[in-house]
Amino acid sequence: MEATIKVVLLGDSSVGKTSIVTRLKSGKFLAKHAATIGAAFITKTIEVPSNDSSTEKRIHMEIWDTAGQERYKSLVPMYYRDANIALIVFELGDVSSLQCAKTWFQDLQDRAQGTQVIIVGNKYDLVCEEHSGEVTIPAELQGLPYVAVSAKTGYNFDTLNKIIISLVPESQFKTLSKNNEQGNILEINKKKSGSGCIC
C-alpha cells in the first residue's frame, strides 16, 4: 500500500530548507549550493514500519523546496495548492527567523487551511543542547508538531520522518500493483546519525 503526499518547505532565506531537502532525499549534506529560485522539486519514498509483515506500506513524498528571498515570496503561495504537509523552517538561535515563521504560518492558513504543519528548528549543530531547549515557540505556533534538527549532521531526521508518517491518514493509503511500486526507500529505523555539540 502506498500514499502519495505533497510536502512543501517554507521559511526565510538561509534557514537551511535546501539542506533539509537534500538530507531527506539522500541522507547527505552539501556545504555549498545555489540559492533556490522560485521552487525546486524532488521525490522520496519512505517505508512505514509495521508489525504486520504481510502488508508493506510506503509514503511517496513530492517535496517542494521554496525560495525564501523577499523578491520570490510572491511566487511561493502557488506551491501551497494541494499540499498535505508544510514544514515551516526557522534557524535555531535566530529569533528573527522564528518570528518570521509566524508570518509563513499565517499566510499558509489564509491560503491552504487543510495543510498539516510541522515546525522545524534547523542548525541544531550550531547551538548547545541545553540552549536548544530554551526555544520559546510563539503562541500562534504552539500546539503544532515541533522538532529540532541538524541538516548538517542528520540529527533528529528519524524523528522528523516519524512525525510526517503520523500525519498521513490511513484513508490516503492505496493498494498498488507490484509494477507500480516505487524504489528509493528510506528505512527510518536506521540508527540515527551522531551529532556533537561544540560551544
Swiss-Prot record:
Keyword entries, A-Z: Cell membrane, GTP-binding, Lipoprotein, Membrane, Methylation, Nucleotide-binding, Prenylation, Protein transport, Transport
Modified residues (Cysteine methyl ester): 199
Gene Ontology MF terms: enzyme regulator activity; GTP binding; GTPase activity; guanyl nucleotide binding
Signal peptide span: none
Subunit composition and interactions: Interacts (via C-terminus) with GDI1/RabGDI. Interacts with YIF1, YIP3, YIP4 and YIP5. Interacts with CCZ1 and MON1; interaction is stronger for the GTP-associated form than the GDP-associated form.
Binding site for GTP: 11-18, 65-69, 122-125
Gene3D superfamilies on file: P-loop containing nucleotide triphosphate hydrolases
S-geranylgeranyl cysteine lipid sites: 197, 199
Subcellular location: Cell membrane; Vesicle
Additional remarks: Present with 1360 molecules/cell in log phase SD medium.
InterPro entries: P-loop_NTPase, Rab, Small_GTP-bd, Small_GTPase
Function: Protein transport. Probably involved in vesicular traffic. Specifically binds guanine nucleotides. In its GTP-bound active form may be involved in recruiting the MON1-CCZ1 complex to membranes enriched in phosphatidylinositol 3-phosphate (PtdIns[3]P) or other charged lipids, leading to recruitment of YPT7 and downstream effectors involved in endolysosomal maturation.
Protein family (similarity comment): Belongs to the small GTPase superfamily. Rab family.
GO cellular component: cytoplasm; endomembrane system; fungal-type vacuole membrane; plasma membrane; vesicle
GO biological process entries: endocytosis; Golgi organization; intracellular protein transport
Protein name: GTP-binding protein YPT10
Membrane topology: Lipid-anchor
